[in-house]
Amino acid sequence: MQDRTLTAEVTPGDEITVAGWVHEIRDLGGIAFLILRDRSGKIQIKFEKDEMNDEIVQTGLDVPRESVISITGVADDEPRAPTDVEIVPTAIEVLSSADTELPLDPSGKVNADLSTRLDNRTLDLRKKEVKAVFQIRSEVLRAARDAFRELGCTEINTPKIVATGTEGGTELFPITYFGEEAFMNQSPQLFKQLMIGSGLERVFEIGPIFRAEEHNTPRHLNEATSIDFESAFINHAEAMDACEYVVTAAYQGVAENCITELETLGLRDGFSVPDESFPRISYQEAIERINATGELDEQLVWGDDLPTDGERALGADVGSHYFITDWPSEIKPFYIKDHDDDKTLSTGFDMMHPQMELVSGGQREHRYEHLVSGFEQQGLDPEQFDYYTKMFRYGMPPHAGWGLGGERLVMTMLGLENIREAVLFPRDRQRLSP
């Protein structure tokens, strides 16, 4: 429809054609109003029954809500209309008629549970609050991409079907690949590192990851979006600097470019961009501060992973984004480098929101012999990862990086109760369709 005008661009006095969904119809007797909705907003269509063609009136008032229609008419000033403008139609066409009974109410007047919403995601997205979440998500990814480019990164796309898992273990989805066993990739980690050895030096990727985790919680998914960064010739502290930069840029992009969406969600007044200097807390300090809160039934000891309740207790204590550094080597992956002066401490770090972990990263082990030793210490066969390890014999620079959960970033940024609200079509233990 080349002659179509968006509702937000309608100017009084013009004869225009608008098209969209029937949001609401109000019949007041001699006069009736239809509210038309498109991606830019809404506009009022006025039907004066005694002064208009009967066919136009009947078509406009009999069409079911959420049908798709096209209307041609003259736009007039009308201060009482929702947008101060209304259209008096001279022609109307029903492009697609909707069922009279819908599985949920896109106007939002009748609430639906999350399962019903996800079963009917297309209808759900017609609600302005839901659409706002995904417009903000789009801005988060755009801002992250721009930030990576400002850091001198090259965008890459790594395989999602692999012969071996990044970290081994059971959190893998097996598939049959032309008669051979293969897996859906749980992380682009190993391929990112290969790109460091290629000479690209600094790369990023925004793409899907797959984890066959049994978790069924409001913050876990089995298919998620990972925002990944890897750079040569930096250490773990400089990788944390880059993490702060990208996360802050995402918030800044939303603050500058999503004012309407934040207003729709009731978040504009309270939305703030974090300072680009997150506190850095050692693992030892973290467990001491968690224990001091008294929130856990049992005290944490060195070598324990941090439970969800512990993360929340520490987050409430810190009150902002922060890093946990200097984790025990024994609980970090084989590719994370240890500190040179203390082999019991890794250079691994996690970046936390007060509610949950967002980022995992660290300096990588770039020395071939140490890398192979790390495989063996974690019970992995280095021969199965030969495509990866052999490149470390050909000249691999020191490097560091991280991976950021895209959905978790949006979830925590907007205060969503369930991570599935930040995904168009979530994949979890119960949901494979739509």
From Swiss-Prot:
The keyword Transport does not apply. It comes from the Archaea. GO terms for cellular component: aminoacyl-tRNA synthetase multienzyme complex; cytosol. Binds 3 Mg(2+) cations per subunit. The strongest magnesium site (Mg1) is bound to the beta- and gamma-phosphates of ATP and four water molecules complete its coordination sphere. The keyword Cytoplasm applies. Keywords: Aminoacyl-tRNA synthetase, ATP-binding, Cytoplasm, Ligase, Magnesium, Metal-binding, Nucleotide-binding, Protein biosynthesis. The record marks 82 as: Important for tRNA non-discrimination. Its cofactor is Mg(2+). Its EC number is 6.1.1.23. Residues 189-192 are annotated as: Aspartate. It catalyses: tRNA(Asx) + L-aspartate + ATP = L-aspartyl-tRNA(Asx) + AMP + diphosphate. GO terms for molecular function: aspartate-tRNA ligase activity; aspartate-tRNA(Asn) ligase activity; ATP binding; magnesium ion binding; RNA binding. Mg(2+) 3 binds at residue 357. ATP binds at residues 211-213, 219-221, 357, 405-408. It is found in: Cytoplasm. PROSITE patterns: AA_TRNA_LIGASE_II (PS50862). GO terms for biological process: aspartyl-tRNA aminoacylation. Mg(2+) 2 binds at residues 357, 360. L-aspartate binds at residues 167, 211, 360, 364. Homodimer. Belongs to the class-II aminoacyl-tRNA synthetase family. Type 2 subfamily. Aspartyl-tRNA synthetase with relaxed tRNA specificity since it is able to aspartylate not only its cognate tRNA(Asp) but also tRNA(Asn). Reaction proceeds in two steps: L-aspartate is first activated by ATP to form Asp-AMP and then transferred to the acceptor end of tRNA(Asp/Asn). This is Aspartate--tRNA(Asp/Asn) ligase. It comes from Haloquadratum walsbyi (strain DSM 16790 / HBSQ001).
